[in-house]
């Protein structure tokens, strides 16, 4: 919970003091469970994962089940293209398909959000009660999902020796205005 609270503080600071009321984090060990609760996610493999799973050859279209989902969204070191950009593109593709399937399940089964929460609870850290989370899932099921918001900036090695992202100030202000404010009429 402490790492989540530190993240809430960091995100609030990044977003120019915008309030972050709740948090929910999932341990990566929950990817397989989440994937399988959605019924598996079908993808066409642009990278070759066959050294990790023989069914995951480049060019194949497969429905990811169990550990295959984690291999798909996390792997980069065992691939010829070991960059994070390729992995991030896969993650965006995967999440779009996963969310669409979860939305469908939420629309068709009023109890699904509770079942999903119970299945994922060993992997979750959240400041939300079970009831609030279920009610929120039920409320947002009818929302129209917008494209992920991207803040421009640059990546460079920080004083600690690790790669860091430095947000473009104008892009950041624009994002905060888009997310948290409505134009006066």
Residue ranges and their predicted role:
Residues 60, 64-67, 123-185:
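C-terminal solvent-exposed extensions
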Residues 4-12, 28-32, 36-38, 66, ...:
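Extracytoplasmic/secreted envelope proteins and their assembly/folding machinery
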Residues 1, 10, 16-22, 77-86, ...:
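Second-shell loop/turn segments in exported
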Residues 22, 49, 99, 112, ...:
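Phenylalanine-focused residue identity feature
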Residues 28, 48, 77-78, 138, ...:
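Residues that form or immediately flank small-molecule/cofactor binding pockets and catalytic motifs
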Residues 1-56, 127:
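Amphipathic, coiled-coil-like alpha-helical scaffolding segments used for oligomerization/assembly
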Residues 29-112:
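Flexible, polar/acidic helix-loop-strand segments at domain edges
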């Amino acid at each position: 919970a402490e790492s989540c609270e530190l993240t809430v503080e960091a995100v609030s600071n990044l977003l120019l003091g915008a309030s972050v009321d709740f948090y929910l984090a999932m341990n990566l060990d929950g990817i397989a469970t989440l994937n399988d609760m959605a019924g598996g996610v079908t993808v066409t493999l642009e990278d070759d994962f066959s050294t990790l799973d023989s069914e995951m050859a480049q060019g194949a279209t497969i429905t990811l089940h169990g550990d295959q989902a984690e291999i798909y969204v996390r792997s980069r070191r065992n691939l010829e293209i070991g960059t994070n950009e390729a992995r991030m593109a896969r993650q965006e593709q995967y999440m779009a398909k996963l969310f669409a399937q979860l939305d469908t399940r939420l629309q068709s089964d009023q109890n699904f959000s509770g079942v999903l929460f119970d299945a994922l609870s060993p992997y979750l850290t959240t400041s939300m009660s079970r009831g609030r989370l279920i009610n929120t899932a039920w409320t947002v099921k009818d929302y129209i999902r917008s494209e992920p918001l991207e803040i421009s900036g640059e990546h460079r090695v920080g004083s600690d020796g690790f790669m860091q992202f430095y947000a473009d100030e104008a892009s950041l202000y624009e994002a905060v205005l888009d997310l948290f404010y409505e134009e006066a009429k």
